[in-house]
Design a protein with these regions (language model features):
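Interdomain hinge/linker at the junction between the two RecA-like core domains of SF2 helicases
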Residues: 1-49
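C-terminal helicase lobe
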Residues: 35-133, 137-214
Length: 214
C-alpha cells in the first residue's frame, strides 16, 4: 500500500504493541465433537454475559465465524442448529447465498442488509457469519467471538476476533472472550482411506464420518 500510494517512510506509523487488553484469547480442543462443544460454549457465554437481562437492548452479543456458507459446518446450518437447540434468535450472514436458502435475487441482498442493521440495533444477539461480515461494522457490545474451526490466517483471526471488545469501558475489568475450536489431527488411517482410489463409496462415507466431514 505504501508503494502504491507513494507514501514516504517518514509518514508511516507502526504501532509498538498489537495486543488488545480488552480481549482474552482461548483455543479449545473439541475432540471431534465441534457442534456439541459450540452449543456448550455459547450456553456458557450467554450465562456469563446475559444472565438476568430484561431486554435485548441490555444484552451483550456474540459472533460465530465459520469457514464456509454451506453444509453442516456452514453459517446457514449452524444458525438453524443454534436457534433450535438453544431457543434463541440466531441469524446468519454470508457473502454468497446459501444453497439451501429459498431467497432469490435482490431478496438475499435485502436480507443481508436487514441482518446487519438489526444486529447493530441490538434486535438479536447471536450471529453466525463467514469472513464476509463487514469490517466496517462497529458494534460496541460484542462480548465474544467463536471461530468454528481454524481461521484462514493469523491476520484473519485478529481482524475477526477483533469485532469483540470495541467499547473498552465495557470490557476493561472483564475482557471479551475470543475462542477458536479445533480438532487435533489423529485420524491418519481414515485420511489414508479417503485418498486411496480403491476405497469403495460406502467405506469412503464411513471414513468421512469419522473425520466429521460432510
Amino acid at each position: 500500500m505504501q508503494s502504491e500510494f507513494s507514501i514516504p517512510d517518514s509518514n508511516v506509523r507502526t504501532p509498538l504493541v498489537f495486543t488488545r487488553e480488552e480481549l482474552s484469547f482461548h483455543v479449545l480442543d473439541d475432540a471431534g465433537r465441534k457442534t456439541n462443544e459450540l452449543l456448550t460454549l455459547v450456553s456458557e457465554m450467554e450465562s456469563k454475559w446475559n444472565s438476568g437481562i430484561s431486554s435485548e437492548q441490555e444484552a451483550k452479543a456474540g459472533i460465530v465465524f465459520t469457514p464456509t456458507v454451506n453444509w453442516i459446518k456452514g453459517c446457514y446450518a449452524l444458525a438453524s442448529k443454534l436457534k433450535s437447540d438453544l431457543g434463541m434468535d440466531v441469524r446468519y450472514f454470508s457473502g454468497e447465498k446459501p444453497k439451501q436458502s429459498s431467497l432469490k435475487g435482490d431478496k438475499f441482498d435485502t436480507y443481508k442488509q436487514k441482518v446487519q442493521n438489526d444486529f447493530k440495533a441490538n434486535k438479536y444477539r447471536l450471529l453466525t457469519a463467514t469472513k464476509a461480515f463487514g469490517m466496517g461494522v462497529n458494534k460496541t457490545n460484542i462480548a465474544y467471538t467463536i471461530h468454528y474451526g481454524i481461521p484462514s490466517s493469523m491476520e484473519a483471526l485478529y481482524q475477526e476476533a477483533g469485532r469483540a471488545g470495541r467499547d473498552k469501558k465495557l470490557f476493561t475489568e472483564t475482557p471479551a472472550n475470543c475462542y477458536v475450536l479445533m480438532t487435533k489431527e489423529n485420524n491418519t488411517d481414515a485420511l489414508d482411506e479417503i485418498w486411496d482410489v480403491s476405497t469403495s463409496i460406502p467405506d469412503l462415507k464411513k471414513s468421512a464420518k469419522k473425520l466429521d466431514f460432510e
